UniProtKB/Swiss-Prot annotation:
Keywords: ATP-binding, Ligase, Metal-binding, Nucleotide-binding, Queuosine biosynthesis, Zinc. The lineage of its organism: Bacteria, Bacillati, Bacillota, Clostridia, Eubacteriales. The keyword Kinase does not apply. Belongs to the QueC family. It comes from Clostridium botulinum (strain 657 / Type Ba4). Catalyzes the ATP-dependent conversion of 7-carboxy-7-deazaguanine (CDG) to 7-cyano-7-deazaguanine (preQ(0)). This is 7-cyano-7-deazaguanine synthase.
């Protein structure tokens, strides 16, 4: 198994950016892979490009427009607004069916072609917003499936799986990239960089985590 190279599934948001710099500390060579699925806010791809260019990280953008055709929701359609709060039942309307399944599957194909075993993704079960494809059981099962499907030893790593948003901010702080994550990323479901709109579930979770981080760790 190649212990010197890794691929990061990279959206340009808080979690994947934190994972990107975590990977840079751990591996000699890191490749960031982003996906263009004709998402509503293309600014996230621009953020991903800018971060990789600025910090000299190899970046690959894969075309996955088919996902947009199959999964209409508030992140892929201009006429569907993002719910301001999580529904009492079911998944939020920002959930893109199959997204992490397809992202990780295509990244695995790319990784095998490059002789890379480690795949890093920023999913978290602690703050998973009701998304079923952010759960540890899904990641573990997909890891086994990909290994069997391609007769290859992939290792899907999830540095944020069991930590909350405050602890994710703390990780960025410990890595020395707090300002990068705070100012250069896009987490907002309404496509606003840095602190975002302040109203969507992603912004609320990000802000709540930062305030908890400040209170707990920046005394």
């Amino acid at each position: 198994m190649n212990k010197e190279k890794a691929i990061v599934v990279f959206s340009g948001g808080q979690d994947s950016t934190t994972c990107l710099f975590w990977a840079k500390k751990k591996y000699k060579e890191v490749i960031a892979v982003s996906f263009d699925y004709n998402q509503k806010h293309k600014l996230e791809l621009e953020c991903a490009k800018d971060i990789c260019k600025k910090y000299n990280i190899e970046h690959k953008i894969l075309d996955l427009n088919l996902l947009n055709q199959l999964a209409p929701n508030s992140l892929t359609r201009q006429d569907i607004t993002v719910d301001k709060s999580a529904p009492k039942e079911g998944v939020p309307n920002s959930f893109v069916d199959g997204r992490n399944l397809l992202f990780l599957s295509f990244v695995a194909v790319f990784a095998k072609q490059r002789g890379i075993n480690a795949i890093i993704t920023g999913v978290s079960q602690s703050d998973f917003s009701g998304y079923p494809d952010c759960r540890d059981v899904f990641i573990k099962s997909l890891n086994v499936t990909l290994n069997l499907a391609m007769d290859y030893e992939f290792e899907i790593l999830t540095p944020l799986m069991w930590i909350n948003k405050a602890e994710t901010w703390k990780m960025a702080y410990d890595l020395g990239v707090l300002d990068i994550v705070k100012e250069e990323t896009l987490t907002c479901y309404n496509g606003i960089k840095a602190d975002g709109c302040g109203e969507c579930p992603a912004c609320k979770l990000r802000k709540k985590g930062y305030l908890e981080f400040e209170k707990e760790y920046l005394k």
